[in-house]
Design a protein with these regions (language model features):
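Membrane-interfacial terminal anchoring regions of lipid-handling membrane enzymes
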Residues: 1-299
Length: 299
């Protein structure tokens, strides 16, 4: 945090201006830290505000923001996250300590996914704030209110593009299927069918699906499902009950928060439909025109 540290803030500001002038790429984390729930955090504007201020003073140099989504099939810190969400103290992050734990080195963590969202152009966003494209307009063309609006516009746009670029993995789909049903456990066949339904919905919503999850026809691969199940079994997030017909998978009761993390990485894709269904449920006749639903959703 830069609060109360004017010298530190000034040095960082000057350093970023120097890097921009010389054409270097800058990396920063718009959320300000790691999400403990799997849901995207609201944008933090401190560094972004400094970067925008510096960029507005440049001439003859295009500045663009590249949203990047980094997703994990299984996270190393899941135990610490669950403890924090359950009311425990936040532990200082120390990757060295994690890697020295024997269980960490023996466990499987699956794949890591890096995806890029739509590139955001500073000049275009500035034109959106001003209402028209102004050539060679620097910081002087923006009032303090407009500058704040520009920073917030870019920050929220970056987070949105990251959310749209997030990969739906077999693990996230399996977690959602296991948590969002009325029974305690699901047979392998029922789990497969539920995951197929969720996959079809995600495809309709335009979500990016992990290539490993799909066969040549775009259908859910059973071995991808089994691999996700194996990751959760290895992490002791679910239990497997053998039966004569089909194994049954059940979330471990005190590890549900960990499963929620993986479910939450894709839950935002379902929000628009959920809002429409909620608006429809509020209609007395359970039917409404498109205009009435839009008005209800936008309230």
């Amino acid at each position: 945090s830069f609060q109360g540290k004017k010298l530190y803030a000034g040095l960082v500001d000057a350093y970023m201006r120097k890097l921009l002038v010389e054409g270097f790429t800058l990396e920063f984390f718009i959320e300000g830290g790691r999400s403990r729930t799997g849901k995207l955090l609201t944008p933090k504007f401190g560094l972004l505000s400094m970067l925008v201020d510096a960029a507005l003073l440049l001439r003859n140099r295009k500045v663009r923001f590249v949203p990047i989504s980094i997703g994990y099939e299984r996270i190393i810190e899941q135990k610490a996250y669950v403890e924090e969400l359950s009311g425990g103290d936040k532990q200082k992050e120390n990757i060295g300590g994690l890697l020295r734990t024997p269980a960490i080195l023996r466990s499987r963590y699956g794949r890591l996914y890096v995806q890029f969202g739509e590139i955001i152009d500073l000049e275009q966003e500035k034109a959106g704030v001003l209402g028209s494209a102004l050539e060679d307009a620097g910081a002087a063309a923006l009032s303090p209110k407009q500058r704040r609006a520009l920073v917030q516009r870019i920050g929220h746009r970056v987070v949105y593009e990251i959310s749209q670029a997030t990969i739906a993995t077999p693990a996230s789909i399996v977690a959602m299927a296991l948590l969002d049903h009325s029974r305690r456990g699901l047979s392998h066949q029922s789990l497969h069918e539920t995951c197929k339904i969720l996959l079809a919905a995600l495809q309709r919503f335009g979500a990016r699906i992990a290539a490993v999850a799909l066969d040549e026809q775009g259908e859910l691969r059973d071995d991808a499902l089994r691999e996700a199940i194996a990751l959760f079994l290895d992490g002791k997030l679910i239990t497997k009950h053998e039966t004569e017909e089909d194994p049954i998978y059940e979330p471990v009761s005190d590890r549900r928060l960990a499963l929620e993390y993986y479910k939450n990485t894709i839950i935002h894709f379902f929000v628009p439909s959920a809002m429409v269904f909620s608006a429809l449920a509020l209609q007395p006749s359970r039917s409404a025109t498109r205009a009435a639903l839009r008005a209800q959703v936008e309230r």
